[in-house]
């Protein structure tokens, strides 16, 4: 932004970094593409080639959704400003209601995961290890996961895209809030799994039980429809989400 300002002045122009300088005209914002990876370069938001990798994929997707649900106000505060409040909600900007868009594929996978029984979903074999009862997750195509431009926090194939930050801000605040929320949620996930293991559950069964509970609890934050619609504002209020600008 500093470079843009200097260069524009050099050519007798000015850069408008205001989120909504003109009423009725599209405003400006920033999209933060966010993912997580291991020290070996493995993207934790990419489905793997086997069922074990897919369980890892589901684990990190579900915990991210859970973090957005539990710390919704923190994420909203990280992008809040008077000028951004004028931008959010119309003309290609995401709404002020923070929700997650997953797309049909991932939503169906999570619904199936939630509704399956432990016995149906997990088989533990001494030689082969963990098996998931549902088939291998198909290759995720950008076209199938990135259609909803009205979502402020959308899954886009191998990452999440946080679309709410304004054009004049440093994205560090939004990323700090998101990283902190997900990190804290992963710590809680570990505690919940270990608590079930202490009761005698195997690690695989404990992970599955915790994920099922998280999927059910965080459902109010999931929305794949039109974020601009009045129906969504009413539905979001019923779900207990923050609907204020």
Regions found by a protein language model. Name each.
Residues 5-14:
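Secondary-structure boundary elements
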Residues 7, 21-22, 51, 56, ...:
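Acidic, glycine-enriched catalytic cores built around paired aspartates
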Residues 13, 18-24, 30-31, 37-41, ...:
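An acidic- and aromatic-residue-enriched active-site/binding cleft used to recognize and process polar
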Residues 14-16, 26, 33-35, 44, ...:
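Structured core elements
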């Amino acid at each position: 932004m500093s470079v843009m300002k200097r260069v524009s002045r050099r050519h007798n122009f000015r850069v408008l970094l205001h989120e909504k300088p003109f009423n009725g005209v599209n405003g400006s914002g920033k999209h933060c593409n966010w993912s997580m990876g291991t020290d070996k370069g493995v993207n934790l938001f990419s489905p793997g080639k086997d069922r074990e990798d897919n369980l890892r994929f589901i684990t990190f997707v579900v915990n991210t959704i859970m973090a957005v649900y539990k710390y919704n106000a923190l994420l909203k505060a990280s992008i809040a400003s008077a000028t951004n409040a004028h931008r959010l909600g119309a003309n290609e900007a995401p709404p002020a209601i923070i929700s997650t868009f997953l797309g049909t594929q991932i939503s169906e996978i999570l619904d199936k995961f939630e509704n399956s029984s432990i016995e149906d979903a997990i088989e533990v074999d001494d030689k082969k290890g963990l098996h998931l009862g549902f088939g291998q997750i198909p290759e995720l195509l950008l076209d199938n996961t990135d259609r909803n431009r009205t979502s402020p926090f959308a899954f886009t194939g191998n990452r999440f895209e946080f679309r709410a930050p304004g054009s004049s801000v440093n994205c560090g605040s939004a990323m700090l809030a998101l990283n902190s929320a997900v990190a804290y949620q992963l710590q809680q996930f570990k505690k919940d799994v270990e608590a079930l293991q202490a009761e005698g559950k195997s690690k695989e069964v404990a992970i599955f039980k915790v994920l099922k509970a998280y999927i059910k609890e965080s459902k109010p934050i999931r929305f794949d429809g039109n974020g601009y619609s009045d129906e969504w504002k009413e539905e979001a209020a019923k779900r207990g989400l923050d609907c204020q600008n």
